[in-house]
Amino acid sequence: MSDLVTRLEEHTTRLARDAQHHCTTIQTQFNTLLKDANIQPKVALYAALFFATFTWLAITLSRLLLTRRRPTSRPSTPNLEKRSPFKAPDRPPGVWHPSPFTRPTASPYPNWSLSTTKPLPYRPFRYGPKYNITMGLRNMSWDEWIELDNEYSSYHSLKAARIAERGEKCIKTAPEAMSAAKELLEELVGYLPQRYPSLFQEMKLGRGKGMKNLETGEVFDVEGCARDGEREDPMKMCARMIQDDLAIMVEKEDGQYYLLAGAILLAGFWRLEDKFGMPLSTIHTSGDVPGFKDKLEKPMSNFFRRIQPQSPVLRNNYFIQVDDKLAWSESIGSEDAKEDGGIGWFTAEKNKAVDHHWFRSERQSLRRLPKSGGVVFTIRTYFHPITDIAQEPYVPGRLASAIRSWGEDVSRYKGKEMYGDVLLEYLDKKHAEQVEGGLDVDGEEDVARGYPF
């Protein structure tokens, strides 16, 4: 694009120079003509001035139009593998100066209903042949921070059961992250009644504010960190409000961000107790995240250092699971197991029938809290049978292409060996059926551009 703009500028300059030369030539010829025709000099001068002014306006207008064609705003999805256009913050590592930023008031979700609003159809996979390992961030609208739908009640019940059964194994807050956890609680109590007024109602409780869940009757007291009059960890209170899991990263004096607060109840394949207190880099290396050292560590570190309260972002990922358990995938082993070599999708049962295959997609938001400086992850899991999403136009062909594009490291991380043969055979069959049924294959590219849907 920069080369194109440069060439256009050079071309415009040449046009201006040629125009000026032609003006001079024409003026000389014009004066000769006037002299031969015995026309008054004053009239000739006015005519020449008019012609010169008209030429200058034409050249100026062409340059103005060229300038307006140049891109003046950064793209909505920045490439964080390249150098960031923003300077690193002018503060020592581990020190945060509170920001005056206030989250914009959320607009009510149009026609939202606890019974009829369906989960958003995230399908965050792309056609091969290349699988790019990037952070995959895009800008977030503040209205979109938390997504709730007609699966809210089942998620709420499952979370309540997990809290009762596993308690601190799933929810922890370190003392140095308590201020961030309380700030997150305040943010949710401010946001949810604005975005979902038919489900949440803001309340005045004593000296502070609170919120009531109109479906469950729960009352949340921000000032007292209490639910229904009983004190609770603020992260536990937050977890009860929404369908997402939550994590807060806090920067220490070494410049690294540590997982110091979390409510991880529905992760499926990783445990908070294994990662709690770790820096971001160790969390990823201990989990064998593909390409982390080579492609992700530096841009991720830069991103966390530079993210500002007014600039939240989103990302999506996906996995294949071979059982129907949302909270913990039982096919990979016991949630309390201490396996040599770790536990993950690569320890799942092998070659189970496709009826046992589920599509597990995460929609994550990241934002910095303005007062405490903590960086909050919200992790919303969407969970559907493969046999359901494979009925959607283009999905089986696109998903099969994406799976085949995984490299060896990605394939191991996602457990492809455990289900690949069975799943790909099924997806190929469903894609062939769609093509035979008249699917416009040329339309696939248009669908792919709708990422992450």
Regions found by a protein language model. Name each.
Residues L4-F453:
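Extended, well-ordered protein cores
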